[in-house]
């Protein structure tokens, strides 16, 4: 393996001169620079990324922390982050925390030690002080951390209002909301949107909680429908939760949408593959990842930010789990 000393010897210059050429710092004569570049080419020398990281305290890497790689929402998000990051010359390091505080803490410390240039958080289980102490540029994606960390999110509350209003427009009289975990920003915002509408319209409603997992959503829905058989509409806090609700309804002999109408939230491809296809509130997942990455790189490059809160609109996509239509879209 060719070393920096081999390059120096081949170019007949000092190691320090080679280092100055590689790092573009300090004076080097034109002749010496050309000799070094020629030696690098002839020897096919590849500078050590580790050594360069130690020298510059930078790595050309961006960390992306996600809570659950098995949730179809996050691979699509990661694709956007990777696409944008690569156009700016950055490599993305994906860290799956499994919604565990200690895993998140260990990943962040490891990224710090490797001089990662910035981090995109889709998890936020640690106290703000721990994020602050890392002293790394950060962006929170769909998870509010603190006013000092820029947030990129969908208009979750407005989207939840769209979903709930649609169920009412289709004749639902007793609506259940299967909300996500408490303390998770998008779940809280969607719950708030739902509650606003049912209280404004004075509609019979019930709220239960479930993690963003199909199996738990199925169990919660079954218990819900057994206890309250007159429920005729469900607004699920994610498409994955909606899929679990659909499975429970099917196993109980409920006809969708005749007996029970269901609306999800996310707009992942899974929704269109289900039978019947899922009516959902679609959020621009790719745009969320792309905007977050550009915002992070702006911080890394020490450029001023226009705002610390970016909200991206959602839209209602009406399919077969509600009576509003088949594979039609409403803005």
UniProtKB/Swiss-Prot annotation:
Keywords assigned by UniProt, alphabetized: DNA-binding, Repressor, Transcription, Transcription regulation
SMART domains for this protein: HTH_LACI
Leader sequence segment: none
UniProt-listed InterPro entries: HTH_LacI, LacI/GalR-like_sensor, Lambda_DNA-bd_dom_sf, Peripla_BP_I
Gene Ontology molecular-function annotations: DNA-binding transcription factor activity; transcription cis-regulatory region binding
SUPFAM superfamilies on file: lambda repressor-like DNA-binding domains, Periplasmic binding protein-like I
DNA-binding among keywords: yes
Record-annotated DNA-binding residue ranges: 4-23
PROSITE patterns: HTH_LACI_1, HTH_LACI_2
Domain HTH lacI-type: from-to ranges: 1-56
Record-linked PANTHER family: LACI-RELATED TRANSCRIPTIONAL REPRESSOR (PTHR30146), RIBOSE OPERON REPRESSOR (PTHR30146:SF95)
Biological function: Transcriptional repressor for the ribose rbsDACBK operon.
The protein's name in its UniProt record: Ribose operon repressor
Organism: Halalkalibacterium halodurans (strain ATCC BAA-125 / DSM 18197 / FERM 7344 / JCM 9153 / C-125) (Bacillus halodurans)
Taxonomic path: Bacteria, Bacillati, Bacillota, Bacilli, Bacillales
Underlying gene: rbsR
